């Protein structure tokens, strides 16, 4: 049976297509918008049955043109948290997602989709409950509003609906994301260009470089998506992070030490990296004061209760792998 991946040429979508191929699945319809043509590179080493533009796809899917579809991995969205065109964001992330959802419900197709930790906004609790959700930008609101639709239809849905609130994702195939690419990606490129990584200094009670995020490898995102694909009886909205809050210092030191290892140089402690000028702290920008999250950490209680019990990569494990992959692409 046919599988469909929207956002297939993007960061997470292309990693899903590749993982499905590795499981022997090649009857995949890839859906995307290649206005940014450079994204095609993410699909060069993948096997797909067909490619469709996102607009053509949703119309044809609603008509039932693709016969029996087993599942849709809906990863397509505008993920730029700096986007200020609210009409575009809502059309792309909310209205379009509703159209795909409606067609899945009508045809009994498994629907696995990307939500976001941006639904929590400035909250200090990250649990899948309405009272802690307070998005701070229109991107977060578009994801939040769609999650509310899901909550209303879940009690009567006769096919799987599984949404995943992605936290700070890093890993292969993200280079097209430019400013929205991961901290690890930018640290890698900055170190190669300047010989050092720059991090924010002290802010809001956090020491220099000690502001934390839940950083999660795209490898783990793919594994969770495939776990739920294999368990169509499991539905709901789930946090998808590592469950750990790790500081930006961990990302930077792992990137630098991984690159040093590739050059045959020994690993250095954080203090040594700072002393040698390989990590540098800069004043916290005034423009970000009052708008910056110093802490995120996914509560994985609900995900674990749904049966996903595999461990998640630490920053040290996942970023080291990623740096080695990036170095092989240069």
UniProtKB/Swiss-Prot annotation:
Catalyzed reactions per annotation: ADP-D-glycero-beta-D-manno-heptose = ADP-L-glycero-beta-D-manno-heptose
An example molecular function term from Gene Ontology annotations: NADP binding
SUPFAM superfamilies named among the record's database cross-references: NAD(P)-binding Rossmann-fold domains
Positions bound to substrate: 168, 179, 186, 200-203, 213, 292
Positions annotated as active site in the UniProt record: 139 (proton acceptor), 177 (proton acceptor)
Top EC class, one word: isomerase
Binding of NADP(+), residues: 11-12, 32-33, 39, 54, 75-79, 92, 143, 169, 177
Entry keyword set: Carbohydrate metabolism, Isomerase, NADP
CC cofactor note: Binds 1 NADP(+) per subunit.
Cofactor(s) demanded: NADP(+)
EC number(s) reported in the record: 5.1.3.20
Database matches in PANTHER family: ADP-L-GLYCERO-D-MANNO-HEPTOSE-6-EPIMERASE, NUCLEOSIDE-DIPHOSPHATE-SUGAR EPIMERASE
Domain comment (free text): Contains a large N-terminal NADP-binding domain, and a smaller C-terminal substrate-binding domain.
Subunit relationships: Homopentamer.
Job description of the protein: Catalyzes the interconversion between ADP-D-glycero-beta-D-manno-heptose and ADP-L-glycero-beta-D-manno-heptose via an epimerization at carbon 6 of the heptose.
Family statement drawn from the similarity comment of this UniProt entry: Belongs to the NAD(P)-dependent epimerase/dehydratase family. HldD subfamily.
Protein name stated in the entry: ADP-L-glycero-D-manno-heptose-6-epimerase
Organism, scientific name: Paraburkholderia phymatum (strain DSM 17167 / CIP 108236 / LMG 21445 / STM815)
């Amino acid at each position: 049976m046919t599988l469909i991946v929207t956002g297939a040429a993007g960061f997470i979508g292309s990693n899903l297509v590749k993982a499905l191929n590795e499981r022997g699945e090649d009857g995949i319809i890839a859906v995307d918008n290649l206005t940014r043509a450079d994204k095609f590179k993410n699909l060069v080493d993948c096997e797909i049955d067909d490619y469709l533009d996102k607009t053509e796809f949703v119309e044809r899917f609603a008509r039932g043109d693709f016969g029996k579809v087993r599942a849709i991995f809906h990863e397509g969205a505008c993920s730029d948290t700096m986007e200020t065109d609210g009409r575009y964001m809502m059309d792309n992330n909310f209205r379009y997602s509703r159209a795909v959802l409606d067609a899945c419900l009508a045809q009994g197709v498994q629907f696995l989709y990307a939500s976001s930790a941006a639904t929590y906004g400035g909250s200090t609790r990250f649990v899948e409950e309405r009272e802690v959700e307070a998005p701070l930008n229109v991107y977060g609101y578009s994801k939040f509003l769609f999650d509310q639709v899901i909550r209303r239809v879940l009690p009567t849905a006769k096919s799987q609906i599984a949404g995943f609130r992605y936290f700070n994702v890093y890993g292969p195939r993200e280079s097209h994301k430019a400013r929205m690419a991961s901290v690890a990606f930018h640290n890698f490129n900055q170190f190669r260009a300047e010989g050092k990584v720059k991090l924010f200094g002290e802010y809001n009670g956090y020491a220099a470089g000690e502001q934390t995020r839940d950083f999660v490898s795209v490898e783990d995102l793919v594994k969770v998506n495939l776990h739920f694909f294999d368990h169509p009886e499991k539905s709901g909205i789930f946090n998808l992070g590592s469950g750990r809050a790790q500081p930006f210092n961990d990302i930077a030191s792992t990137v630098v030490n991984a690159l040093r290892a590739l050059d045959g140089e020994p690993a250095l402690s954080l203090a040594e990296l700072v002393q040698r000028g390989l990590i540098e702290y800069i004043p916290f920008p005034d423009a970000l004061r009052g708008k910056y999250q110093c802490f995120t950490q996914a509560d994985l209680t609900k995900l674990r209760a749904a049966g996903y019990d595999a461990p998640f990569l630490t920053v040290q494990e996942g970023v080291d792998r990623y740096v080695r992959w990036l170095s092989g692409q240069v």
